[in-house]
Amino acid sequence: MSEPLIQLKGIERRYQSGEQEVTVLHPLDLTIEAGEMIAIVGASGSGKSTLMNLLGCLDRPSSGQYLFRGQDTATLDALSLARLRCHHFGFIFQRYHLLPHLNAAANVEIPAVYAGTSRAERQARSQALLTRLGLSDRSHHTPSQLSGGQQQRVSIARALANGGEVILADEPTGALDSQSGKEVMAILKELHAQGHTIILVTHDMEVASHADRIITLKDGRVQEDSGRKPAAVPVTPTAAPAGKEGVGHDWDRYREAARMALHAMLAHRMRTFLTMLGIIIGIAAVVSVVALGQGARAKVIDQINAMGTNTIDIFPGKDWGDEKAASIQTLNKRDLDALLGQPYLEGASPQIAAPGQLRYRNKTSSGSIVGVGNDFFRVKGMKLTNGRLFDERDIQNRAAVAVVDGKTIESLLGKQDPVGQVVLVGTLPVRIIGVVEEETGFGRSSQSVNVWLPYSAVMSRLISQNHFSQLTIRVKDGVQPALAEQAAIELLTQRHGVKDFFTFSSDSIIKSVEKTTATMTLLVSAIAVISLIVGGVGVMNIMLVSVVERTREIGIRIAVGARQSDILQQFLIEAVMVSLLGGMLGVGVSLFIGLLFSLFVESIQMHFSLFSILMAFGCSSLIGILFGYLPARNAARLDPVEALARE
């Protein structure tokens, strides 16, 4: 004798109601053979729905044994029970329980998704089942576009998606007109004839009369069992295509979860947008601040480079503001010669500032009069635009010649060619021999008038001084500025016998600017992070609301074979999608801000980096995971019986 399909031994179900324990099903024994068509009847409150939930593994008995093909279901964990529901049971509900945002074909495919069937196979099976049930022309219609009878046939097709070895039909005709009810019962009888085990749960004796065996329940006890009728050898029902595990299965699950998430987001567009708003603001703020900081940094570094790249300035005294600096006269020609002989330096030039006014004919202007060496313009990276620069002969001869910039020409000479013109620098007449580009680097104004003379001429013919106010050196390419600076300090300290000077390099300015920029970026980013956290809380709140609104959908998915991990994954992916979309919109807003900024502000350009954009997406994804986990976990832990009963 073959083993029974289903055996219930002393099954009992009790619920806690306040402080009292209510027994819904008293100990009962029941055996169901494969291929039977059974009707479980009884009045409301008789326990028939509870028995159906136990048979379909949606609920667990309080005591007793439930054996399916000899396997005690009490020994199965949640994952094994989900597989049992997925591969062996098919549910048909009184209210159809179709997902309203999916069409008929997609509703039928749901169990096959959780079974791991490939997309092509489940689509083909879905279409075949709908055609078999007379709905081939309705496969792309949503439930709202179908009649009650058509919806119930879609429900039957869904129950058969994975083979439907056991079909549990809860009041299958309860919401249908008489004609549709007859059609549904005819389909169930046909399925029974094909070898499916059919279990009807109904209070309608007319519906029950279609079954070969009727079990009557009253007050949680079996009042009557008509007994099994002899039947032909059951035919094995057609099984669903074999499911798969691994990457392909996981990809199908992810894709299905993403599709469901998109449907849920589109169903509540305004709510979804408001949920994203905090994330949009936070991401836009972070990306914009970083871009602005990078733009400001690039601007300052460009200005510093305009002063002369890899340059180090040497000043007398201990530091800026040293009162004794004016009395220190140790920076001299011998120091300059010693520095010029160092292999790590490309050039060196002194600087001596001289007071005085500039006069040309009847025009007078105040400006910067500086004595420099012939290496000065190369050290500073200044380009000649007209004439020539100083040479060593001019330095040796203390020549009364000058190099000027465009601002000096504009202020004194107007539009005439400046080269060859004689201007009065203080009391010394000098001839202009060259023009260089205006100095507009870091700390310099493009409005200043600049005149450069050989330092020897300034020291002997303008002021009586045999020491330099400043030395500027340029480090060779490939040499680390910090090492060159340290070597120069050691050289001059050894020569002077004491360190009576200090250095200031473009590298130190850059580091200071980068530190300041990083601090400001961190400060504003911290404020933006608060906005992101607020946005994350908004995501969590809306996902909690979504779980409540979609409780019945969760129950349906569990009934057709979804595991807890499937439900957790679906809602977690939805939270991540909301956050990611918010991140994308935030980056878009930031790029738009950058475009507007470039139209109205010319001095600084916002520099958007791929790293900051990727970080923005990473942050938004992390927010989705962190703040979406709690709602997703709540969804996965829902009791399927309570979820299905929720209106």
Swiss-Prot record:
Listed GO CC annotations: plasma membrane
Keyword match Transmembrane: yes
Localization of this protein: Cell inner membrane
Residue intervals passing through the bilayer: 273-293, 527-547, 581-601, 610-630
UniProt cross-references to InterPro entries, sorted A to Z: AAA+_ATPase, ABC3_permease_C, ABC_transporter-like_ATP-bd, ABC_transporter-like_CS, MacB-like_ATP-bd, MacB_PCD, Macrolide_Exporter_MacB, P-loop_NTPase
Location of region: Disordered: 223-247
Topology versus the membrane: Multi-pass membrane protein
GO molecular-function terms, A-Z: ATP binding; ATP hydrolysis activity; transmembrane transporter activity
The EC number(s) this enzyme carries: 7.6.2.-
Classification via Pfam families: ABC_tran, FtsX, MacB_PCD
UniProt xrefs under SMART domains: AAA (SM00382)
Annotated residues for binding of ATP: 42-49
CDD domains: ABC_MJ0796_LolCDE_FtsE
Domain of life: Bacteria
Record PROSITE patterns: ABC_TRANSPORTER_1, ABC_TRANSPORTER_2, MACB
Domain ABC transporter, first and last residues per copy: 6-244
Entry keyword set: Antibiotic resistance, ATP-binding, Cell inner membrane, Cell membrane, Membrane, Nucleotide-binding, Translocase, Transmembrane, Transmembrane helix, Transport
GO biological process, alphabetically ordered: response to antibiotic
Low complexity bias: start-end ranges: 230-242
Major location (coarse): membrane
Its biological purpose: Part of the tripartite efflux system MacAB-TolC. MacB is a non-canonical ABC transporter that contains transmembrane domains (TMD), which form a pore in the inner membrane, and an ATP-binding domain (NBD), which is responsible for energy generation. Confers resistance against macrolides.
Assembly mode: Homodimer. Part of the tripartite efflux system MacAB-TolC, which is composed of an inner membrane transporter, MacB, a periplasmic membrane fusion protein, MacA, and an outer membrane component, TolC. The complex forms a large protein conduit and can translocate molecules across both the inner and outer membranes. Interacts with MacA.
Family: Belongs to the ABC transporter superfamily. Macrolide exporter (TC 3.A.1.122) family.
Name recorded for this polypeptide: Macrolide export ATP-binding/permease protein MacB 2
Gene responsible for this protein: macB2
